[in-house]
Amino acid sequence: MPSRSKSSQRWLKEHFADPYVKKAQAEGMRSRAAYKLEELLQRDRLLKPGMVVVDLGAAPGGWSQQVRKSMGDSGRVVALDILDMPALAGVEFLHGDFREQAVLSQFEAMLGDVPVDLVLSDMAPNKSGMDAVDQPRMMHLAELAMEFADTHLKPGGAFLIKLFQGVGSDDYIRELRRRYEKVTIRKPAASRKRSPEVYALGQGKRVQIK
């Protein structure tokens, strides 16, 4: 157990020394992940006034908060999560599992006939510390997010998702290329260097999968 204790202490020390953690606390953002998204949104100019943005696995709300901040009062931000999330001004939150038809029906009722312009997913499993367990779980969540975008994202729309580099990630990116005109892999500055995470961005959703 001592090694785990040292590891936990090291993580806590790094966490509280992290400039993005300090920035999030100072600016009232719910998570440091908001700054990963901020860089990606600006770099690829993903947001336009009046867009409809869906944030999958949104809790604690850092990404939804960043999108609302970036778009001002225009457009709609719809956040979904199986975990509860305290209310955010200008964000519509749906609490539930989007794999369930009842939750999807609620989502569709919320949107009405309004098309979705951008689907975001920063979902990740609770880590066990074993790649053989964590990577398949991560890829399963990624598959679910891609299926959601297949169904709900409008033609020409964009899909941004967090992936862990490892078994299955290359195949997943190939699947994205069948669905989107342009696929780019990003590693934002706020992403910890030792983390296996990258962000895959699909732009220009095809009408039909190639």
Curated annotation (Swiss-Prot):
Where in or outside the cell?
Cytoplasm
Alphabetically sorted, this entry's keywords are: Cytoplasm, Methyltransferase, rRNA processing, S-adenosyl-L-methionine, Transferase
Q: What is its EC number?
A: 2.1.1.166
Q: Identify which residues the record assigns to the active site.
A: 162
Any one annotated GO CC term: cytoplasm
Instruction: Give the EC class as a word.
Output: transferase
Q: Which Gene3D superfamilies match?
A: Vaccinia Virus protein VP39
Give the InterPro entries listed for this entry.
RNA_methyltr_RlmE, RNA_MeTrfase_FtsJ_dom, rRNA-MeTfrase_E, SAM-dependent_MTases_sf
Which chemical reaction does it catalyze?
Answer: uridine(2552) in 23S rRNA + S-adenosyl-L-methionine = 2'-O-methyluridine(2552) in 23S rRNA + S-adenosyl-L-homocysteine + H(+)
Binding annotation for S-adenosyl-L-methionine: 61, 63, 81, 97, 122
Entry's Gene Ontology molecular function annotations: rRNA (uridine-2'-O-)-methyltransferase activity
Function comment: Specifically methylates the uridine in position 2552 of 23S rRNA at the 2'-O position of the ribose in the fully assembled 50S ribosomal subunit.
Sequence similarity: Belongs to the class I-like SAM-binding methyltransferase superfamily. RNA methyltransferase RlmE family.
Q: Which NCBIfam families match?
A: PRK11188.1 (NF008390)
Q: What is this protein's name?
A: Ribosomal RNA large subunit methyltransferase E
Biological source species:
Xanthomonas euvesicatoria pv. vesicatoria (strain 85-10) (Xanthomonas campestris pv. vesicatoria)
